[in-house]
Protein backbone atom coordinates (compact mmCIF):
# COMPACT_ATOMS: atom_id res chain seq x y z
CA UNK A 1 0.00 0.00 0.00
CA UNK A 2 1.51 3.31 -1.08
CA UNK A 3 0.95 6.20 1.31
CA UNK A 4 1.00 9.72 -0.13
CA UNK A 5 1.42 12.94 1.82
CA UNK A 6 0.41 16.36 0.56
CA UNK A 7 0.76 19.60 2.48
CA UNK A 8 -0.58 23.10 2.11
CA UNK A 9 -2.46 26.01 3.59
CA UNK A 10 -5.69 25.33 1.68
CA UNK A 11 -7.10 28.79 2.37
CA UNK A 12 -10.27 29.54 0.40
CA UNK A 13 -10.42 26.03 -1.03
CA UNK A 14 -10.53 26.24 -4.84
CA UNK A 15 -10.18 24.13 -8.03
CA UNK A 16 -6.37 24.41 -7.94
CA UNK A 17 -6.34 22.71 -4.53
CA UNK A 18 -8.69 19.98 -5.77
CA UNK A 19 -6.48 19.36 -8.82
CA UNK A 20 -3.35 19.14 -6.62
CA UNK A 21 -4.95 16.70 -4.19
CA UNK A 22 -6.48 14.60 -6.98
CA UNK A 23 -3.10 14.31 -8.71
CA UNK A 24 -1.42 13.47 -5.39
CA UNK A 25 -4.02 10.79 -4.65
CA UNK A 26 -3.39 9.20 -8.06
CA UNK A 27 0.20 8.48 -6.96
CA UNK A 28 -0.83 5.85 -4.42
CA UNK A 29 -3.43 4.15 -2.27
CA UNK A 30 -3.85 6.49 0.72
CA UNK A 31 -3.72 10.28 0.81
CA UNK A 32 -2.78 12.05 4.01
CA UNK A 33 -2.82 15.84 4.07
CA UNK A 34 -1.08 18.17 6.50
CA UNK A 35 -2.86 21.51 6.76
CA UNK A 36 -0.53 24.35 7.71
CA UNK A 37 -1.03 25.96 11.10
CA UNK A 38 -1.93 29.65 11.06
CA UNK A 39 1.24 30.42 13.02
CA UNK A 40 3.44 28.67 10.43
CA UNK A 41 2.18 30.60 7.40
CA UNK A 42 4.97 33.17 7.11
CA UNK A 43 5.70 33.21 3.36
CA UNK A 44 2.39 34.83 2.37
CA UNK A 45 -0.47 36.71 4.07
CA UNK A 46 -2.08 34.97 7.02
CA UNK A 47 -4.99 32.69 6.08
CA UNK A 48 -8.49 34.14 6.01
CA UNK A 49 -10.11 30.87 7.07
CA UNK A 50 -9.07 29.46 10.47
CA UNK A 51 -6.87 26.38 10.62
CA UNK A 52 -9.70 24.37 12.20
CA UNK A 53 -12.11 25.23 9.38
CA UNK A 54 -9.48 24.56 6.70
CA UNK A 55 -8.80 21.18 8.31
CA UNK A 56 -12.52 20.38 8.38
CA UNK A 57 -12.92 21.24 4.69
CA UNK A 58 -9.93 19.15 3.59
CA UNK A 59 -11.09 16.21 5.72
CA UNK A 60 -14.50 16.41 4.02
CA UNK A 61 -13.00 15.75 0.59
CA UNK A 62 -13.60 12.18 -0.57
CA UNK A 63 -10.12 11.89 -2.09
CA UNK A 64 -8.47 12.54 1.30
CA UNK A 65 -8.12 9.62 3.69
CA UNK A 66 -6.95 11.73 6.63
CA UNK A 67 -6.06 15.38 7.13
CA UNK A 68 -4.37 16.77 10.21
CA UNK A 69 -2.87 20.03 11.37
CA UNK A 70 0.87 20.40 11.09
CA UNK A 71 3.21 20.82 14.04
CA UNK A 72 3.86 24.37 15.17
CA UNK A 73 7.45 23.49 16.13
CA UNK A 74 8.78 20.86 13.71
CA UNK A 75 7.33 20.30 10.25
CA UNK A 76 8.76 16.77 10.22
CA UNK A 77 7.00 15.68 13.44
CA UNK A 78 3.73 14.48 11.81
CA UNK A 79 5.73 12.54 9.21
CA UNK A 80 7.05 10.26 11.97
CA UNK A 81 3.48 9.03 12.47
CA UNK A 82 2.29 9.12 8.85
CA UNK A 83 5.43 7.51 7.36
CA UNK A 84 4.66 8.45 3.74
CA UNK A 85 6.16 6.66 0.76
CA UNK A 86 5.71 9.71 -1.46
CA UNK A 87 5.45 13.40 -0.64
CA UNK A 88 3.58 15.40 -3.26
CA UNK A 89 4.56 19.06 -3.64
CA UNK A 90 2.47 21.63 -5.45
CA UNK A 91 3.97 23.51 -8.38
CA UNK A 92 4.29 26.64 -6.22
CA UNK A 93 5.49 25.13 -2.95
CA UNK A 94 8.86 26.52 -1.95
CA UNK A 95 10.60 23.26 -1.06
CA UNK A 96 13.54 21.93 -3.06
CA UNK A 97 12.66 18.28 -3.74
CA UNK A 98 16.24 16.97 -3.52
CA UNK A 99 17.01 18.83 -0.30
CA UNK A 100 13.75 17.61 1.21
CA UNK A 101 14.53 13.98 0.31
CA UNK A 102 17.99 14.33 1.90
CA UNK A 103 16.56 15.81 5.10
CA UNK A 104 13.93 13.08 5.30
CA UNK A 105 16.59 10.37 4.88
CA UNK A 106 18.69 11.95 7.67
CA UNK A 107 15.67 11.73 9.95
CA UNK A 108 15.00 8.09 9.07
CA UNK A 109 11.97 8.98 6.97
CA UNK A 110 12.89 7.93 3.44
CA UNK A 111 10.30 9.10 0.93
CA UNK A 112 10.27 10.09 -2.70
CA UNK A 113 9.32 13.70 -3.38
CA UNK A 114 7.21 14.40 -6.46
CA UNK A 115 6.25 17.85 -7.73
CA UNK A 116 2.73 18.11 -9.16
CA UNK A 117 2.75 20.42 -12.19
CA UNK A 118 0.48 23.43 -12.60
CA UNK A 119 -3.06 22.51 -13.52
CA UNK A 120 -4.84 23.80 -16.56
CA UNK A 121 -5.40 27.51 -16.26
CA UNK A 122 -8.65 28.66 -14.72
CA UNK A 123 -9.55 32.17 -13.66
CA UNK A 124 -9.96 31.47 -9.94
CA UNK A 125 -7.45 28.68 -9.27
CA UNK A 126 -5.50 30.52 -6.60
CA UNK A 127 -6.40 32.11 -3.29
CA UNK A 128 -4.79 35.37 -4.42
CA UNK A 129 -6.92 35.44 -7.58
CA UNK A 130 -10.08 34.85 -5.54
CA UNK A 131 -9.22 37.68 -3.14
CA UNK A 132 -8.50 40.07 -6.04
CA UNK A 133 -11.80 39.20 -7.71
CA UNK A 134 -13.78 39.70 -4.47
CA UNK A 135 -12.13 43.10 -3.96
CA UNK A 136 -12.80 44.07 -7.58
CA UNK A 137 -16.47 43.14 -7.33
CA UNK A 138 -17.25 44.24 -3.79
CA UNK A 139 -14.45 46.68 -2.96
Curated annotation (Swiss-Prot):
Q: Which cofactor does it need?
A: a divalent metal cation
GO MF = ATP binding; FMN adenylyltransferase activity
Q: Which residues form the signal peptide?
A: none
Pfam annotation, one family = CTP_transf_like
Top-rank taxon, per record: Archaea
What Enzyme Commission number(s) apply to this enzyme?
2.7.7.2
The answer to whether UniProt assigns keyword Flavoprotein to this entry is: yes
Q: Which GO terms describe its biological process?
A: FAD biosynthetic process; FMN metabolic process
Q: Which reaction does it catalyse?
A: FMN + ATP + H(+) = FAD + diphosphate
Q: What class of enzyme is it?
A: transferase
User: Which keywords describe this protein according to UniProt?
Assistant: ATP-binding, FAD, Flavoprotein, FMN, Nucleotide-binding, Nucleotidyltransferase, Transferase
Q: Where does ATP bind?
A: 9-10, 14-17, 92
Q: In which pathway does it act?
A: Cofactor biosynthesis; FAD biosynthesis; FAD from FMN: step 1/1
Q: Please name the InterPro entries in this protein's record.
A: Archaeal_FAD_synthase, Cyt_trans-like, FAD_synth_RibL, Rossmann-like_a/b/a_fold
Instruction: Indicate yes or no for the key word Flavoprotein.
Output: yes
Q: What does this protein do?
A: Catalyzes the transfer of the AMP portion of ATP to flavin mononucleotide (FMN) to produce flavin adenine dinucleotide (FAD) coenzyme.
Similarity section: Belongs to the archaeal FAD synthase family.
Instruction: Tell me the subunit arrangement.
Output: Homodimer.
| Record protein name field | FAD synthase
Tell me which species this is from: Methanosarcina barkeri (strain Fusaro / DSM 804)
Amino acid sequence: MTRILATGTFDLLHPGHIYFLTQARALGDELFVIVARDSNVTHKPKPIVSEEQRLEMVNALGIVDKALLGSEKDMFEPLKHIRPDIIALGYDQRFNAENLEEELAKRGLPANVVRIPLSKECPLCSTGAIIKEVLKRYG
